[in-house]
């Protein structure tokens, strides 16, 4: 392969990667658990942007038997669901970006 052509392809790949990172950073997914008691926003890079806990869920922690574990589970579930949604967006974007390259299935 022509070295100039190879350099040009590498430059294009780097530019595409930068564009993808910008797109992922700008993409926001939301997820909630416990009927909306806990909600999260995460970007496509799987960075947690916001965690919201309904005050009623916090009030349930007062009293003789606070259910801290339940609130922890709701937070974990919401974060994990947002992560799954962000992963779906990442896979979809990568497939669109690399669709014409005939790469082996399951690589991305």
From Swiss-Prot:
It is found in: Cytoplasm, Nucleoid. Homodimer. The keyword Heme does not apply. GO terms for molecular function: DNA binding. GO terms for cellular component: bacterial nucleoid; cytosol. Coiled coil: none annotated. This is Nucleoid-associated protein ACP_0492. Its main location: cytoplasm. Binds to DNA and alters its conformation. May be involved in regulation of gene expression, nucleoid organization and DNA protection.
């Amino acid at each position: 392969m022509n070295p100039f052509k190879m350099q040009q392809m590498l430059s294009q790949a780097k530019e595409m990667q930068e564009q993808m990172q910008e797109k992922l950073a700008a993409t926001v997914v939301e997820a909630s658990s416990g009927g909306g008691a806990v909600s999260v926003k995460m970007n496509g890079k799987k960075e947690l942007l916001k965690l919201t806990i309904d005050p009623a869920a916090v009030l349930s922690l007062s009293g003789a038997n606070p259910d801290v574990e339940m609130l922890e589970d709701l937070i974990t579930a919401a974060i994990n669901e947002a992560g799954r949604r962000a992963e779906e967006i990442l896979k979809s974007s990568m497939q669109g970006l690399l669709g014409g390259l005939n790469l082996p299935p399951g690589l991305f």
